[in-house]
Amino acid sequence: MLALEIFRSIPRYAAARAVGSRMPGLLVGPMAPVRLVTRDEPVVRRPGWAQVRPLLSGICGSDLGAVTGSTSLYFSALVSMPFVPGHEVVGELVEDCEDLPRGTRVVIDPVLACAARGVAPCPPCQAGRTNVCNHITVGHLAPGLQTGFCQDTGGGWGERLTVHRSQLHAVPDGLSDERAVLVEPLSCAVQLARRAQVPPGASVLVSGAGAVGLFAVLALRELTEAGRITVIAKHGRQADLARAFGATDVAAPDEAMRAVRRTTRALRVVPPSLPGPAGRLASAGEMLLGGVDVAIDAVGSTSSLETVLRSTRAGGRVVLSGMPAPVDLSPAWFRELEVAGTYASSGDAFEVALDLAAQAPLDDVVGGRYPLHRWREALDHAHSAGRLGTVKVCFDVRSRA
């Protein structure tokens, strides 16, 4: 089968770490740790497993992190290389899978938890929290936190992948492929809304208006009784979509603190500049005394994390949805913030996400579709999606055009 593969190469990984975040365009050239290959179809010869033919497969920020080398080394033991990426997938069963007949359109919960690995349920899985399974490196599969990061299962960036019944959700007949491919990221937004624990009428800040941030706004409006939702958006179309999805206020990154002050009447504090490295003056940056009740980082960058930590009221809640970067945690200590992570989804989040995908204003959210052999263009587009007015870029695995 034809597939895109991320492989281990120390020189290319070093290059990715050195330039990936600053010049991501270089990483779709010869230095990319990605290659288009012909490889055997993945097969797991265990009960409950079946092959899926991907139709559309999204390009996620975590996929781009793997390509650019910006992913934390924390995850290095939780993947197995080489692997075929792609965990945002709508596909078609090519064989029966227990109660699901061949030809059923499905979306995939990518987490490779105890049921998929053939081991006794760990405490999180017993509690229904499969997204934080303790057994993602054991069982009959190679290590891999998700489909799309495990060498044994394949991923959506290939012509076949293999999936366990516990991961499969049938797609209703009336739901288009373009909406169905958004179900996995929407399920993450459902998980986020629940982890945020937003009290009725509470003020919320969402830093970032890519797919993660926009879907967070949508889920917060649908599933909570949040009051004002302020979104930090870099680009015009992001701002328009944020309002369409339920934001009450939208601000540019350099206006974030001012926007929060305006809506919460917080007090602005600007620390003095002090001597820093090489004798240069450095400032800790402004902060607020007061602020929003709940702040959500949907980017994972240092600047975004600083924004949410410095604009949340004392005792407020900060939710980390983007893959975190290094940051000064002094505000979390000093303001007694509750800091919560949110990762993937669990419970009935996929069923809720299927309903959202059918009802929400998601037309044209998928703004770029590419065949596998045009992967360089696809990744370049995904790197620049916000600037280009695109929310989600996908591989159309059926296409050879």
Regions found by a protein language model. Give the residues of each.
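Glycine-rich helix-loop-beta junction characteristic of Rossmann-like nucleotide cofactor-binding loops
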Residues: 194-199, 222, 287-288, 310-311
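Adenosine-nucleotide cofactor-binding segment
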Residues: 203-209, 221-303
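Glycine-rich beta-strand-centered segment in the early N-terminal region that forms part
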Residues: 40-57, 72-126, 172-174
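N-terminal Rossmann-fold NAD(P) dinucleotide-binding loop
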Residues: 213-214
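NAD(P)H dinucleotide-binding glycine-rich loop of Rossmann-like/cofactor-binding domains
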Residues: 76, 87, 114-207
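Short N-terminal strand-loop motif that marks the start
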Residues: 1-88, 155, 159, 398-401
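Glycine-rich phosphate-binding loop and adjacent beta-alpha segment
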Residues: 243, 263, 299-359, 397-401
